[in-house]
Amino acid sequence: MSYRIGIDIESISDVQAAAEKHKQFLDKVLTKSEQKQLAGRKGNGYYAYLAGRFSSKEAYAKATGFGIGSKVNFTDIEILDDENGAPRLSVSGRSLFLNAKSYQISISHKIKLDLVATEVLIEVEDGNSDS
């Protein structure tokens, strides 16, 4: 087994500004299911959630080594809260990292500091870690 790790840090207010400036931002970054979870958030939680998902998808792209755009699309990556509120990552389409055995994700918000930090760990079967 081998592991691929991606880490990202984003400014919550920068993500907020992008979402407010570009009407298509939510549709380009979030799946329909993620948008439904976002709609239930109020106040600071709304943009913290959005920044967390954006940052997590950036971290996933870094872990794969492809980056967003070439082989990884934002909406092929979905991060939904489970019944306990923990984020769970799933991937489809051309963003699927072949030979991935599992995905782990961590999202940390520091609203007073205007930051979200994320980490994605991909457990890969040995032998071929490329897609």
UniProtKB/Swiss-Prot annotation:
Domain of life: Bacteria
GO MF assignments: holo-[acyl-carrier-protein] synthase activity; magnesium ion binding
Database matches in InterPro entries: 4-PPantetheinyl_Trfase_dom, 4-PPantetheinyl_Trfase_dom_sf, ACPS, Ppantetheine-prot_Trfase_dom
Reactions performed catalytically: apo-[ACP] + CoA = holo-[ACP] + adenosine 3',5'-bisphosphate + H(+)
Top-level enzyme category: transferase
Entry-linked Gene3D superfamilies: 4'-phosphopantetheinyl transferase domain
Compartments where found: Cytoplasm
Enzyme Commission number: 2.7.8.7
Keyword line: Cytoplasm, Fatty acid biosynthesis, Fatty acid metabolism, Lipid biosynthesis, Lipid metabolism, Magnesium, Metal-binding, Transferase
UniProt cofactor(s): Mg(2+)
Residues binding Mg(2+): D8, E58
One GO location term (cellular component): cytoplasm
GO biological process, one term: fatty acid biosynthetic process
Similarity comment: family membership: Belongs to the P-Pant transferase superfamily. AcpS family.
Protein name per Swiss-Prot or TrEMBL: Holo-[acyl-carrier-protein] synthase
Source species of the chain: Oenococcus oeni (strain ATCC BAA-331 / PSU-1)
